[in-house]
A protein has these predicted regions:
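Short, flexible domain-boundary/linker segments around small modular repeats
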Residues: 2-20, 70-86
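Short acidic alpha-helix initiation/capping motifs at coil-to-helix transition points
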Residues: 4-5, 24-28, 90-94, 105
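Generic structural marker for isolated residues within well-ordered, non-membrane alpha-helices
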Residues: 10, 33, 45, 76, ...
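N-terminal interaction modules that seed assembly of large macromolecular complexes
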Residues: 20-46
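Short, structured motif recognition centered on aromatic/hydrophobic residues
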Residues: 29-36, 48, 95-102, 114
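Extended intrinsically disordered, low-complexity coil regions enriched in Ser, Thr, Gly, Ala
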Residues: 38-71, 106-132
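Short, solvent-exposed interaction modules
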Residues: 58-109
Length: 132
């Protein structure tokens, strides 16, 4: 699998999040990936990082610390706390925009393994349907 290019990643986040500027898309991506990195370990985190642009890979590999795994709702609230002026609603938009691009970069096999490391309910944030 090839590493996604910086501009392609940012353009995809900007389009999905409907951000007016690349700066806003980058801010959302940095925050969401820093929080996501705290929830992943080992091979899956390293493999996912290898598919992201280098700057974002480093953020994923050097995450914000989380005392405990956050369920999806708390993950969104934590994102809102890190983004100036964000509400839970806008943060959910930010999280979904970034994580759906991450899921595309990851591919199905890796995404399945990543979701196994996360508390239940993250599928929708990654733009994936819930398993039956």
């Amino acid at each position: 699998m090839v590493r996604m290019r910086w501009q392609a990643f940012l353009d995809a986040v900007r389009e999905r999040g409907e951000y007016p500027t690349a700066h806003e898309a980058e801010r959302a991506a940095r925050t969401v990936l820093a929080l996501l990195g705290a929830h992943l370990v080992g091979e899956e985190r390293a493999e996912l990082a290898a598919r992201l642009p280098e700057t974002f890979a480093m953020i994923l590999l050097n995450p914000l610390q989380a005392a405990e795994p956050l369920d999806p709702e708390r993950f969104v609230r934590a994102t809102a706390a890190w983004i100036d002026g964000a509400s839970a609603e806008t943060a959910k938009w930010d999280v979904s925009a970034v994580l759906s691009v991450v899921a595309d970069a990851a591919g199905e096999d890796l995404m399945s393994r990543v979701l196994l490391q996360l508390p239940p309910g993250y599928e929708l944030l990654f733009g994936r349907p819930r398993p039956d």
